[in-house]
């Protein structure tokens, strides 16, 4: 079972979200109950207690919620080196749906920052395989993502994760990360592209057609607003129902903290509209 090998949290409510229809089906039987599954993919260095605040948005409304954050060293170093180790984690995450026998329920992803997006890109690839192609994804919410090759922003994010580490170790890791990015994604970019596609490019060209909601802020210093706006334009060009909301003043992954009521209403309305469709 994937559950034995993955550090995740799942919350299953006592009552489902709602029924497929408010009235009996034409055959006279009660309509089948829908219980949406929401998978939260945390940002690099995110703690479960941080994701729990977002989890409550959906759990209080009767949704099954799975929370997971990929290890920060995989997010910052494995992906930068072109090592697809996150693909294994993405597969285990999707296997959880079968372990809990919820693979037939409508599925929504809520993805945070580039750390969540790096994992999500492999989810998209796995959804094209025989094992997972029947999963019913109804929508994706992106919070403060995706960003495209912002080294300064990535260094800020990594520095925040390493804040409590020894000063010398923190400096060494930051320098090592910067060197890896410059070497593999600038100097050797043509060679790297032969065996590894950047997650931003992968998302731009993704064949998924379910609705997407992008929540971002022009005040974000980690993921630039222009990167998200460019992604929205690319998805719209591929005829995906993509919508974006600019919170203007909130910092990176801080939109819920600064605008709790508005943020919650956006997520709940999007989830409900996606499930009903």
Curated annotation (Swiss-Prot):
* Annotated SUPFAM superfamilies: alpha/beta-Hydrolases (SSF53474)
Q: Which GO terms describe its cellular component?
A: nuclear membrane; nuclear outer membrane; nucleus
Sorted keywords for this record are: Developmental protein, Dwarfism, Membrane, Nucleus, Transmembrane, Transmembrane helix
Main location as per UniProt:
nucleus
List where the protein spans the membrane: 171-191
- Subcellular location field: Nucleus outer membrane
A GO biological process of this protein is: negative regulation of osteoblast differentiation
Q: How does it sit in the membrane?
A: Single-pass membrane protein
- Which family does this protein fall into? Belongs to the TMEM53 family.
What job does this protein perform?
A: Ensures normal bone formation, through the negative regulation of bone morphogenetic protein (BMP) signaling in osteoblast lineage cells by blocking cytoplasm-nucleus translocation of phosphorylated SMAD1/5/9 proteins.
Q: What illness does the record link it to?
A: Craniotubular dysplasia, Ikegawa type: An autosomal recessive, sclerosing bone disorder characterized by proportional or short-limbed short stature in association with macrocephaly, dolichocephaly, or prominent forehead. Radiography shows hyperostosis of the calvaria and skull base, with metadiaphyseal undermodeling of the long tubular bones and mild shortening and diaphyseal broadening of the short tubular bones. Affected individuals experience progressive vision loss in the first decade of life due to optic nerve compression, and deafness may develop in the second decade of life.
Q: What is this protein called?
A: Transmembrane protein 53
Q: Which organism is it from?
A: Homo sapiens
